[in-house]
Amino acid sequence: MWPLSHRHLCLAFLLVCVLSAISFFLHIHQDSFRHGLSLSVLCPDRHLVTPPVAIFCLPGSPMSPNASSPRPQHPASLSGTWTIYPDGRFGNQMGQYATLLALAQLNGRRAFILPSMHAALAPVFRITLPVLAPEVDSRTPWRELRLHDWMSEEYADLGDPFLKLSGFPCSWTFFHHLREQIRSEFTLHDHLRQEAQSVLGRLRLGRSGDRPRTFVGVHVRRGDYLQVMPQRWKGVVGNSAYLRQAMDWFRARHEAPVFVVTSNGMEWCRENIDASKGDVMFAGDGQEASPWKDFALLTQCNHTIMTIGTFGFWAAYLAGGDTVYLANFTLPDSEFLKIFKPEAAFLPEWVGINADLSPLWTLAEP
């Protein structure tokens, strides 16, 4: 065996030092997750109107310097019982579910959902949170907390072992650091996914008869929002001009797209969306009592055009790809802006197209 030279010994020593440093770094890095998330970093300025309440970005969120995704705590290390009051429609309850899951993990608590939320979501998704029995719910000494719709510092340090949340949270600032886990929770059951893919597979471009190369889901929120937005919130819903601009944005960037339109106002869509190019398909059934068919279609598309509402948000969030949304859809003095922060509602990479507010100015005239 050849004797080791002085140079070989030095190289071996340096190698041991490097390996030791790497091992120490990994140990510290893992401990930081084991002992919880750091919330010392505020979201940097996005050059939007600064909200009166600071919005926190958790590590792993789009605007956080730490882009790694934290590991959820093992169930054995969790304690207490947290739940959330299920309120609103399909998209609202998805937001409540995701927020409960994220905040409970962040605070080291066990999360349970109430039976009505399970009844709304379990037929559609492979959700995993256990259901809280009604008799346990009635006997639990709850403290109640109503959430606003963005992540705040106080939500990261809630000491209550028995907490019932409420409100309509649907902001990525609560749960985007757990995005893969959230997407896993909202995985469609196979039969819904297969049915949606079958519908998309039958679509053809009108002029050529070719298969589309790109599927763009379009959700047009109508229904009660036609009255609620202008009368209560000084706001508008997406009109035909907005939808035309959004579609043109995709036509300019993607080859042979097809627009898969769903809405709770399909008749309006057929009358107001220009389908003369042969690339618009009115595929939704518009049944608000059974929204999962339209939702499944949207999530199986490559990209999304949304107007307003949580249904469109979740379709875009789960589909991935490019998202175009209706921006600045209320007057500046709208009370809606006290409970809704656009910078906390829409992911930074999503593309906003400003709404046409002229109908509101017409209403305001004497």
Swiss-Prot record:
GO cellular-component term (any): Golgi cisterna membrane
InterPro entries named among the record's database cross-references: Glyco_trans_11
Glycan-linked positions: 66, 302, 328
Protein EC: 2.4.1.69, 2.4.1.344
Lumenal side: 26-366
A GO molecular-function descriptor: alpha-(1,2)-fucosyltransferase activity
TM ranges: 9-25
Chief place where the protein resides: Golgi
Pathway terms, separated by semicolons: Protein modification; protein glycosylation
Domain of life: Eukaryota
Keywords on record: Glycoprotein, Glycosyltransferase, Golgi apparatus, Lipid metabolism, Membrane, Signal-anchor, Transferase, Transmembrane, Transmembrane helix
Catalysis performed (reactions): a beta-D-galactosyl-(1->4)-N-acetyl-beta-D-glucosaminyl derivative + GDP-beta-L-fucose = an alpha-L-Fuc-(1->2)-beta-D-Gal-(1->4)-beta-D-GlcNAc derivative + GDP + H(+); a ganglioside GA1 + GDP-beta-L-fucose = a ganglioside Fuc-GA1 + GDP + H(+); a beta-D-Gal-(1->3)-beta-D-GlcNAc-(1->3)-beta-D-Gal-(1->4)-beta-D-Glc-(1<->1')-Cer(d18:1(4E)) + GDP-beta-L-fucose = alpha-L-fucosyl-(1->2)- beta-D-galactosyl-(1->3)-N-acetyl-beta-D-glucosaminyl-(1->3)-beta-D-galactosyl-(1->4)-beta-D-glucosyl-(1<->1')-N-acylsphing-4-enine + GDP + H(+); a neolactoside nLc4Cer(d18:1(4E)) + GDP-beta-L-fucose = a neolactoside IV(2)-alpha-Fuc-nLc4Cer(d18:1(4E)) + GDP + H(+)
Pfam families in alphabetical order: Glyco_transf_11
Localization of this protein: Golgi apparatus, Golgi stack membrane
Record topological domains on the Cytoplasmic side: 1-8
GO BP, one annotated term: positive regulation of cell-matrix adhesion
Bilayer topology: Single-pass type II membrane protein
PANTHER family reported for this sequence: GALACTOSIDE 2-L-FUCOSYLTRANSFERASE, GALACTOSIDE ALPHA-(1,2)-FUCOSYLTRANSFERASE 1
General function of this protein: Catalyzes the transfer of L-fucose, from a guanosine diphosphate-beta-L-fucose, to the terminal galactose residue of glycoconjugates through an alpha(1,2) linkage leading to H antigen synthesis that is an intermediate substrate in the synthesis of ABO blood group antigens. H antigen is essential for maturation of the glomerular layer of the main olfactory bulb, in cell migration and early cell-cell contacts during tumor associated angiogenesis. Preferentially fucosylates soluble lactose and to a lesser extent fucosylates glycolipids gangliosides GA1 and GM1a.
Family (UniProt): Belongs to the glycosyltransferase 11 family.
Protein name: Galactoside alpha-(1,2)-fucosyltransferase 1
